[in-house]
Amino acid sequence: MYIGICICVLLAALSASSTGQQTVGSMNEDPGAREIEQQNILQHPRHIRASSSAQLKPFQRIDGTSDQKAVIGAMLAKYLQTRKAGSSTGRYAVLPNRPVIDPTHRINDRDYMGWMDFGRRSAEEYEYSS
């Protein structure tokens, strides 16, 4: 956290000093140098792009019929309903092909199906192995 603040302060100081040098340098220039710079600009013109708004045309979909929009909307609604119904079981939903653990099992506080606490399992083996 402290390092991040130091880096931000350092970057702010560097950017402020660099912008300060640019403005001071341009104020201390003599008028002859400014004229030479303007002549160089006139001799070597830059190529300027046309404005992007003039090139753009409105986008129209050819295949976007109302039937397709209705089908996509229905599919999206169905997906969201199944997603909401599935989220009530928690982050890890139980898959139908996994075996169901008997509720009378000695270790019944598992978070998910693949859970294994080695300390508790070894204690179980020693405790109930008589």
UniProtKB/Swiss-Prot annotation:
The keyword Secreted belongs to this UniProt entry's keyword annotation: yes
Location(s) in or outside the cell: Secreted
Propeptide section residues: 21-60, 122-130
Tissues and organs where the protein is expressed, per its UniProt entry: Expressed in brain, lung, testis and throughout the length of the small intestine. In the brain, expressed predominantly in the optic tectum and brain stem.
Keyword ATP-binding attributed: no
GO biological process: digestion
Main location: secreted
Family designation: Belongs to the gastrin/cholecystokinin family.
Note: Frog brain contains CCK-octapeptide (CCK8) and CCK7; whereas the gut contains intact CCK33 and CCK58.
UniProt name for this protein: Cholecystokinin
Primary gene name: CCK
